[in-house]
């Protein structure tokens, strides 16, 4: 999968590269990303390490891809399948501020999920997000992930408080 490249309308999902680090540093400092996906990246060396961790798929438990604009190659965000084990996985994503509200995350999640079902033979992919993160709920719904329930106070987010989370999932057998 080292040379994996997926496409979705207007997007290319590709492996992370060292040159992505400068954009990652700027985007992960965005308050909306820090609120829901605090990464602790505060300087360029940390951003380079962050990119290298995501580019290293050797454990077999995750596949992380950069989301780029198909027209100009600009970095628009990231998406990953992680916790891959026994036919199950979780999916996560983030989008750059300039890419929000354009369906980037939904298109990426749909493409990466289809690849996971087809190429990895996954049966179930889960997606969870803070109940207050309405944008992520829309991504889940638009990508065919069904709401299964609420995980009470299940995760501490960037604000330091525990939040309830929505649990969504898609099965390979779902339409």
Question: What do these predicted ranges mean?
Answer:
Residues 94-95, 101-118, 134-142:
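Conserved acetyl-CoA-binding loop-helix of GNAT-fold acetyltransferases
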Residues 16, 126-128, 146-163:
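Conserved catalytic-core motifs of GNAT/GCN5-like acyltransferases
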Residues 61-64, 80, 103, 108, ...:
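Glycine-centered small-residue hotspots that permit tight backbone geometry or close packing
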């Amino acid at each position: 999968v080292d040379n994996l490249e997926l496409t979705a309308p207007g997007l290319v999902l590709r492996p992370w590269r060292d040159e992505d680090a400068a954009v990652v540093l700027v985007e992960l400092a965005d308050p909306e990303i820090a609120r829901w996906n605090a990464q602790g990246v505060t300087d360029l060396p940390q951003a380079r390490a962050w990119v290298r961790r995501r580019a290293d798929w050797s454990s077999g438990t995750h596949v992380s891809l950069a989301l780029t604009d198909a027209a100009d190659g600009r970095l628009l965000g990231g998406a990953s399948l992680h916790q891959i084990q026994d036919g199950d996985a979780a999916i996560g994503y983030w989008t750059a501020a300039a890419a929000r509200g354009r369906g980037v995350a939904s298109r990426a999640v749909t493409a990466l999920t289809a690849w996971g079902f087809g190429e990895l033979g996954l049966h179930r992919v889960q997606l969870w997000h803070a109940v207050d993160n309405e944008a992520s709920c829309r991504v889940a719904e638009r990508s065919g992930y069904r709401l299964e329930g609420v995980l009470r106070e299940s995760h501490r987010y960037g604000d330091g408080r525990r939040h309830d989370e929505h649990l969504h999932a898609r099965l390979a057998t779902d339409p």
